[in-house]
From Swiss-Prot:
Top-rank lineage group of the source organism: Eukaryota
One term of GO molecular function: NADPH binding
Annotated Gene Ontology cellular component terms: chloroplast; plastid
PROSITE patterns found in the cross-reference section: ALDOKETO_REDUCTASE_2
This enzyme's EC code(s): 1.1.1.65
Pathway(s) it belongs to: Cofactor degradation; B6 vitamer degradation; pyridoxal from pyridoxine (dehydrogenase route): step 1/1
Name under which the protein is recorded: Pyridoxal reductase, chloroplastic
pH note: Optimum pH is 6-7.5 for the reverse reaction.
Additional information: Mutants with reduced expression of PLR1 have lower levels of total B6 vitamers but there is no reduction in PN or PNP levels.
One GO BP: vitamin B6 catabolic process
Targeting presequence: 1-15
UniProt similarity note: Belongs to the aldo/keto reductase family.
Active site positions: 94 (proton donor)
Organism in which the protein naturally occurs: Arabidopsis thaliana (Mouse-ear cress)
Gene coding for it: PLR1
Length: 365
């Protein structure tokens, strides 16, 4: 399912540096220079070193989605494909109210209609997440949720089927049922690989061991991971992933937009995000200053620097995209590496900043 591209193709919007300094702050990893056609392994899959998230597609409450945006979303998707991105993350719960599932529907439509994928739709790696709704009480119901996602996506097989969150803290018996559902999806060939989202260190090890006894490898673990989310628990999750051969997918690599440099205490986003920004932004001055300094020195933007840091840590970040401009900017995070000194500068600045991202309430221990 990996997207195969000719290395002679001209790629736009990607700046390149020959700097390949070693990384010493985390467990050393052998990494490519992050060109999108130099895929990284994610279980049995080969994916671009950065994917794109589609949380905003259909979300009116937080991201202000309107159906009039669909054309620009499709243009953004096409540009991502043209530049070698083949990993797209979604969820069966993405979309608000009557638009529930809209993200999957749009992604499926764009894949089917893509001019660059004529007869090759299966080369896109779709990773979707299944919500642990309280009415999904049997493994069969969880498998049916997977089939419903396949219908909305108009595809026969998922790249990665993911459990959206753990129910261990409030419904431990349901948790075992959902794990069995993941196994059945894999055994029935509905998914090429399975993953989890919002799993803390303890539950991550438990589900890995459970799946191993069932003969199913755990491909990926998706958590909030960024310069704003690099606390003790997140680093422990990353260490476990490295040890067990699980690829960490980092969502919200830009901290819901706080690391873009677009906002300040006097310039806040509209909607519910403004409440969070009002709490956190005033304490981010050291980190934002470091991002700005490195971006200016490198001829990059602050988002490109923040995303590149995630890639340097061996994760696959999935920034959200809502426009061609977002894709163009995010693609500039590829084709170069932060030096070790630059990474240390950012990490020190993050620690010096008195505020960090609030932990997702769905993440368990």
């Amino acid at each position: 399912m990996a997207l195969t591209l000719s290395t002679t193709k001209t790629f736009t919007n990607i700046n390149c540096s020959n700097n390949t300094s070693n990384i010493t702050t985390f467990k050393p990893l052998k990494l490519p220079l992050f060109w999108p056609w130099q895929k990284v392994k994610m279980g049995p899959l080969s994916v671009s070193p950065m994917g794109f998230g589609t949380w905003a597609w259909g979300n009116q409450l937080l991201w202000g989605y309107q159906t009039s945006m669909d054309d620009q979303l499709q243009q953004a998707f096409e540009l991502a494909l043209e530049n070698g991105i083949n990993l797209f993350d979604t969820a069966d719960s993405y979309g608000t109210g009557r638009l529930n599932g809209q993200s999957e529907r749009l992604l499926g439509k764009f894949i089917k209609e893509s001019q660059g994928l004529k007869g090759k739709q299966n080369e896109v790696v779709v990773a979707t997440k299944f919500a642990a709704y309280p009415w999904r009480l049997t493994s069969g119901q969880f498998v049916n949720a997977c089939r419903a996602s396949l219908d909305r996506l108009q595809i026969d097989q998922l790249g990665i089927g993911q459990l959206h969150w753990s129910t261990a803290s409030y419904a431990p018996l349901q948790e075992l049922v959902l794990w069995d559902g993941l196994v059945q999806m894999y055994e029935k060939g509905l998914v090429r690989a399975v993953g989890v989202s919002n799993y803390g260190p303890q539950q991550l090890v438990k589900i890995h061991d459970y799946l191993k006894t069932r003969g199913v490898p755990l491909c990926s673990a998706q958590v909030q991971f960024s310069l704003l989310s690099m606390g003790k628990e997140q680093l422990e999750i990353k260490s476990i992933c490295d040890e067990l051969g699980i690829r960490l997918i980092s969502y919200s690599p830009l901290g819901l937009g706080m690391l873009t440099g677009k906002y300040s205490s006097s310039k806040l986003p509209t909607g519910p995000r403004s409440l969070l920004f009002r709490q956190i932004l005033p304490g981010l001055e050291p980190l934002l200053l470091a991002l700005s300094e490195i971006a200016k020195k490198r001829g990059k933007t602050m988002p490109q620097v923040a995303i590149n840091w995630c890639i340097c840590k061996g994760t696959v970040p999935i920034p959200g995209i809502k426009s061609v401009r977002h894709v163009e900017d995010n693609l500039g995070a590829l084709g170069w590496k932060l030096t070790n000194d630059e990474q240390l500068q950012l990490e020190y600045a993050a620690k010096e900043s008195p505020k960090s991202m609030i932990q997702n309430i769905f993440q368990t221990r």
